[in-house]
Amino acid sequence: MSLKDSAKIALSLMDLTTLNDNDTDEKVIALCQQGKTEFGTPAAVCVYPRFVPIARKALKAQGTEQVKIATVTNFPHGNDDIDIAVAETKAAVAYGADEVDVVFPYKALMAGNEQIGFELVQQCKAVCQASNVLLKVIIETGELKTAELIRKASEISIKAGADFIKTSTGKVPVNATLESARIMLETIRDLKVADRVGFKAAGGVKTAEEAAQYLALAQEILGHDWVNSDHFRFGASSLLTNLLAALNGQANQKVSGY
C-alpha cells in the first residue's frame, strides 16, 4: 500500500483529540473545523466531557455530524474508585458522548489487584451499554511496561466488556509503541474476540509513516478487512497535519502535541 493510501485510511480512523487543561469552546470548535478536510473526516473527535455539546453543535454546523464524539473518564490517573469512575461515565453519557474512553485502574493491577479493574470496566460498560455508547478502556501501557501486565490488563478489560482496548492517555512519558500494540492485538486474536473488540493506539503516533506501521501490524495479526473504524482508531492531534502533508505530497512537519 502506498503512503498516500495508508494516510487516507489513517485519517478516517483518527479520534482527533484535544485534552488540554486550557481547552476552551473556541479550541474545540477549531478542532472540529480541522477535521473537515478535502480527504474526508476522522472517525471521531475526542474532548473533555463538558465540551461534548459544543463539539456536537460545531460538527452539525459544518455538515460533518457523522463524526462521532468521544470523551474521557477516570482520566488521566486511572484511580481505583469505582463509584467516581461510574459517576463520571454517567455524566459523559448525559452530555451526549457517543464513545467513552475510561482509564483502567492500572496502578491497582501493578499492585496485584485484578478484581478492581474488572469491576470498574464492567460497571462503566453497563452505563454505556444502556445508552448504546461505545466503551474504550485505556490500559496505560507505558506505565504497565511489561508484556505480562499489558496482556493481563487487556484480558481483564475485554472480559469485563470493553469495546476497544486503548494504549495510553497521552499524559505519561511513554505512550503508544508498536511493541505494546502487538501484545494488545495478539490478545484480541488469542481471545477470539476480533469480531467485537477493537484497538486504539494513542499518543506518540505523529507521522504518516508511523501510522502506516500500526496499520500494517494490525493487518498482519487480525487481517486486512479488520482494519476499519469499527475496530481500529488512532488517538492523536498532531498526526492530522502530517497525514494531510503526505496526502498532498509534502514532507512531514515538526508538530507538537498528542
Swiss-Prot record:
Belongs to the DeoC/FbaB aldolase family. DeoC type 2 subfamily. It catalyses: 2-deoxy-D-ribose 5-phosphate = D-glyceraldehyde 3-phosphate + acetaldehyde. Gene3D superfamilies: Aldolase class I. The active site is at 101 (proton donor/acceptor), 166 (schiff-base intermediate with acetaldehyde), 200 (proton donor/acceptor). Its EC number is 4.1.2.4. One of its GO terms (biological process) is 2-deoxyribose 1-phosphate catabolic process. The lineage of its organism: Bacteria, Pseudomonadati, Pseudomonadota, Gammaproteobacteria, Pasteurellales. One of its GO terms (molecular function) is deoxyribose-phosphate aldolase activity. SMART domains: DeoC (SM01133). Signal peptide: none annotated. Keywords: Cytoplasm, Lyase, Schiff base. It is found in: Cytoplasm. The keyword Cytoplasm applies. Catalyzes a reversible aldol reaction between acetaldehyde and D-glyceraldehyde 3-phosphate to generate 2-deoxy-D-ribose 5-phosphate. It comes from the Bacteria. The keyword Lyase applies. It is an enzyme of class 4 (lyase). GO terms for cellular component: cytoplasm. NCBIfam families: deoC (TIGR00126). Its main location: cytoplasm. This is Deoxyribose-phosphate aldolase. Pathway: Carbohydrate degradation; 2-deoxy-D-ribose 1-phosphate degradation; D-glyceraldehyde 3-phosphate and acetaldehyde from 2-deoxy-alpha-D-ribose 1-phosphate: step 2/2.
